[in-house]
Every structure is written in C-alpha cells, then in structure tokens.
Amino acid sequence: MAMASLARRKAYFLTRNLSNSPTDALRFSFSLSRGFASSGSDENDVVIIGGGPGGYVAAIKASQLGLKTTCIEKRGALGGTCLNVGCIPSKALLHSSHMYHEAKHSFANHGIKVSSVEVDLPAMLAQKDNAVKNLTRGIEGLFKKNKVTYVKGYGKFISPNEVSVETIDGGNTIVKGKHIIVATGSDVKSLPGITIDEKKIVSSTGALSLSEVPKKLIVIGAGYIGLEMGSVWGRLGSEVTVVEFAGDIVPSMDGEIRKQFQRSLEKQKMKFMLKTKVVSVDSSSDGVKLTVEPAEGGEQSILEADVVLVSAGRTPFTSGLDLEKIGVETDKAGRILVNDRFLSNVPGVYAIGDVIPGPMLAHKAEEDGVACVEFIAGKHGHVDYDKVPGVVYTHPEVASVGKTEEQLKKEGVSYRVGKFPFMANSRAKAIDNAEGLVKILADKETDKILGVHIMAPNAGELIHEAVLAINYDASSEDIARVCHAHPTMSEALKEAAMATYDKPIHI
C-alpha cells in the first residue's frame, strides 16, 4: 500500500459551505448586515454572556479579529466551571493524590525508602486553590492584553441586542451588542428526592473541598467526573463504592477498553454496583444511608457512607436568562437550538458550549467559541464533533477520539483492529507503569483511521497524535511509517498502527 501524504491532503474540514436553508441564509445575511461598531460607539460588535472556556476564548478571539467585545461573567472569576470548580481543581487533586499514593505504595519498588507518608489535606486543598487563582488572574490579564471589556455580573436579555446586567457590587447596567453569544455553560444535574447540601451529600463542587477524608464514600454515577473524584478520595484512604443505573461504567467508551478500565479501578479497590437504582437518601443521622434496588426492580438494600457524591451528569444553564422573552427556541433539556454557524432562531443571538447539543467538554466549547466569532467576522469556522477527543483523568488515564468498535458495527462499517499492550513497551516497563494498551480502528478497504482508544498513565497526552491523524484522514500506515523516538510511550501508537495494517515488531 502506497504511503499517503498528509501534506498533500486537502484540508476540507477547515471550511464549510453555507447552509442551503433559506432561513439560515437569511439569518446569516441579516447578522452581517448589522456591520461593526465604531471605536467611539458604546455598542459592542460582540457581547458574550459567560466567561467559561467557551465564552472567554470567544471573547479573546473576537477582539483579535478586530471586533469590539464585552464579556459578562456572574461568578466574578473567569474560567467558568472548568477552571473554578471543575477540570482544573480536579486535576490538581488527582495529581496530588496520585503523588501520595505513589509515595505510599510504589516508592519502595524504585529503591526509595520513606519512613512515613501522611496526608496534609488543608495544604493539598490550598495548592489546588492557588492553581485556580493564578489561572483566573491569567485570563484577566489576557482580557486586558486583548482589550476585552469585562463586566462582573448576572446578565439577562432585554432584547436581541441588549443585556441587562446586575453587577456583583449591587449595581445595574445595560450592555448593547450587534451579536450576542450565550456561553453560560452547565450546572450539576440533580436527582429526584436527593438534596445536595455540599456537606454530606455533595456535587462535584463539594467533592473538591471536603474538610476531611471520608472513611466511606458512595458515588452515584459512573461517568468521567464520578470516577475521577472517586479516585482522588480512594487514593487518600476512602472506601469507594460507585452506584450506576446503567449496566456499564462510562457507556460512551469503547467496550473492550471499558472492561479493562473497570478491572484496573477494581484493583485499586473501587467497588461497583451496576444496574442499581437509588431509591432514596437519608442524611438525618451522622452519616448517609442510601436505599437501593436492582434497576429492573427487586429487593431493596441499605448502603451507608460518610459522604455521598451525586455525579449524574450536567444540565445546560439557560434558565434565568429571559431567552423566552426574545423568542429563543430551546429543546426539552433546555439546550438552545442553533444552526451550523451557532446562530439561534433569533437573528444576532448565538450559543456555544454546554448550552447547545453536543459533548459537554471544555475543549469543545473553546472550539465552538472560536468558530462562532469567525462566522460573525465573516470568516469560515468549523468544529467536527466526530473528532473531539475525550479523556478520563484517572490512573491509568483513558483517552479516545473517533468511533468505537460498537459504533462501527452498528453503522455496518467494515474495519480492522490493531492493538498493542504497554507491557511490551520499553519505556513503560522501565518506569514500572505498563498497564494498558493502544487500540486503533481503521477502514478495511482504505486503511483510514476511524477511531483510536488508549488506556495508559498519560493517555491524555498520547491521544493527540491520533487526533491530528484522524483530522487529516491519515491511514494506520501513515502513523506506522513515521519515526517515533525511542524509548517513548508513543511508540505503542506506532506499533498498534503496524498491527492494524500489517504486523507489529515488538509482540
């Protein structure tokens, strides 16, 4: 098979033809016909409600494109859920707890003697908080550098080009914009009959700031967030039980990878109760009691814990914005309906990130934000949602991009599979961290890579070679014929690619 040249491939994914819908075309032309604000005008070209990953990135990009921009953020700190009470603080705790676990259980294998290792939880939480503060200040600095106006307060629509803002200092102001982008993110999804008090019954926010390590922790929900936070407190000494209504953990994950991942977590003493329904939660006593039953019905049982983490997903934050007053259409879940240029049914009103359909991921929201303001500026923007990577930041990590084997079977696509275990990777063996594998799915006829799934200590970093390859329609042979430095973990991706179209060398 001749090697395909990535450099010669047409990067068709960077552009997109305008929709054939007359309604969409009308909205787009109306939007552009508004023109851009002059430097002396009090009207903005772009107003963004929400300063999370989608909102703040959109604001900076809009300003870089020459658009007068204002960003409104109710929290008083930029970065949204991700930076303040999500991605960043959780990764800080995941890293700190992993260091503690390594010191306690792995240092001896490397000839390092430690007499005693203790958790200083206040110091650990302080390190997490400092990381958050430094990063939020960093975004404020980027706003100043790019001349983005920052308004701290809660914004609501008055009209399609006016937002009333109740500022955090108690004042009120009106912000006008030719184009308004809703980037308000998402909130914790509640469960019927369960009241989150952020003390004994906590959301992911409360789980980031527990005052002590609970002896027993029950996690409701076996998704990304639940497994990550369960890992944090499990490493620090909690007995962790995960209760999940579905029959699998992380249902969107490739089935083969998911099974190995669950076995890995079980080795770390994380317990799973799958196909289990939470009937009620009682926190009136010192601890918390959960009444559960089989998902299909049956005999009930009682589970006891010191803390219960409710991690049953997230819901778009669109209530309280007065969207209905200006006629913006939403679906039953509260997501704003937009076209392929992020424009709602109301001319001049756009939406990005968690408030529109698609994966609720910070990096997806960032891409939405860039593409949206590019459209507003009269340029081409594009986000391919089939090629957005996902990562579970446990240890080992699990990262994926593209299709799973189950999806390809359902779609009737003929494919080949190539796998390579890290047990056969020299760098992984050298650092005594060889759990996991790389799995590549490629089209049987063309060898085009359709999906890549990695379980490894640093899978979240390794996946991006695959993301680039998939975006450029690379074949498995393309990756296999690229020289990879030795010894590196990334050689496992090369070997898996070799296994996909031919044979690997080291197994």
Curated annotation (Swiss-Prot):
Q: Which SUPFAM superfamilies match?
A: FAD/NAD(P)-binding domain (SSF51905), FAD/NAD-linked reductases, dimerisation (C-terminal) domain (SSF55424)
Keyword DNA damage in annotation? no
Q: Which keywords does UniProt give here?
A: Disulfide bond, FAD, Flavoprotein, Mitochondrion, NAD, Oxidoreductase, Redox-active center, Transit peptide
What main location does UniProt list? mitochondrion
Q: What compartments host this protein?
A: Mitochondrion matrix
Cofactor binding, per record: Binds 1 FAD per subunit.
Which amino acid positions bind NAD(+), per UniProt? G221, A222, G223, Y224, I225, G226, L227, E228, E244, V278, G313
Question: According to the UniProt entry, what is the EC number of this protein?
Answer: 1.8.1.4
Which cofactor is recorded for it?
Answer: FAD
Give the first-level EC class, as a single word: oxidoreductase
- What does the protein in this record do? Lipoamide dehydrogenase is a component of the glycine decarboxylase (GDC) or glycine cleavage system as well as of the alpha-ketoacid dehydrogenase complexes. LPD1 is probably the protein most often associated with the glycine decarboxylase complex while LPD2 is probably incorporated into alpha-ketoacid dehydrogenase complexes.
User: How does this chain assemble?
Assistant: Homodimer. Part of both the glycine cleavage system composed of four proteins: P, T, L and H and of the pyruvate dehydrogenase complex containing multiple copies of three enzymatic components: pyruvate dehydrogenase (E1), dihydrolipoamide acetyltransferase (E2) and lipoamide dehydrogenase (E3).
Q: What is this protein called?
A: Dihydrolipoyl dehydrogenase 1, mitochondrial
Q: Gene encoding it?
A: LPD1
